């Protein structure tokens, strides 16, 4: 992962698509990239792992990072759900979603349009990206076509062929 991360950190652009078969560590690589971008004291090889920014990523609480996954996966990996989603699930109004919900994507798009809290820009990590349905993917597409200035996106996928061709074409 370190070699891939170092190579990707040299790239310029606002959207990356990390793809490969299951088990290669796409989420870990995506999170490593995001950590390096948001780190207060990055090294030539990525995030320092010691600063306040790295710490809040470790505890899943960075204000400039939005992680989008199916709710079932977020819960399994210990990532917090948006307040409304958590309230709906707690109140038994619905079960955790098995796909990335369109309202979560719309919230992420709105998130990218706000000012960075720590001055390093905003980052959105989507995993597994193939868990977006067409409506969710289209909610992301406009932002990929006209990205906010300091926002970066990482889409990590085990089945990139299932993504809309227009999504794939907007990513490095």
Regions found by a protein language model. Give the residues of each.
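Conserved adenine-binding aromatic site and its adjacent loop/helix in ATP-hydrolyzing domains
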Residues: 110, 142, 169
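Conserved catalytic/switch belt of AAA+ P-loop NTPases
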Residues: 113, 138-152
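A short beta-strand-to-loop transition that corresponds to the Sensor-1 phosphate-sensing loop
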Residues: 127-129, 155-160
């Amino acid at each position: 992962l370190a070699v891939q991360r170092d190579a990707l950190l040299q790239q310029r652009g606002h959207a990356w698509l990390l793809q490969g078969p299951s088990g290669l560590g796409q989420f870990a690589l995506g999170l490593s990239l995001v950590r390096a971008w948001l780190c207060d004291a990055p090294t030539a090889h990525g995030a320092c792992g010691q600063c306040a920014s790295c710490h809040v990523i470790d505890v899943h609480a960075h204000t400039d990072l939005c992680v989008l996954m199916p709710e079932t996966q977020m819960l399994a990996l210990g990532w917090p759900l948006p307040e409304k989603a958590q309230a709906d699930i707690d109140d038994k109004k619905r079960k955790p979603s098995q796909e990335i919900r369109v309202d979560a994507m719309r919230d992420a798009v709105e998130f990218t349009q706000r000012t960075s809290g720590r001055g390093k820009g905003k980052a959105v990590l989507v995993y597994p990206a193939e868990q977006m349905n067409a409506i969710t993917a289209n909610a992301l597409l406009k932002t990929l076509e006209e990205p906010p200035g300091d926002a970066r996106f990482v889409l990590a996928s085990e089945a990139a062929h299932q993504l809309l061709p227009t999504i794939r074409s907007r990513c490095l």
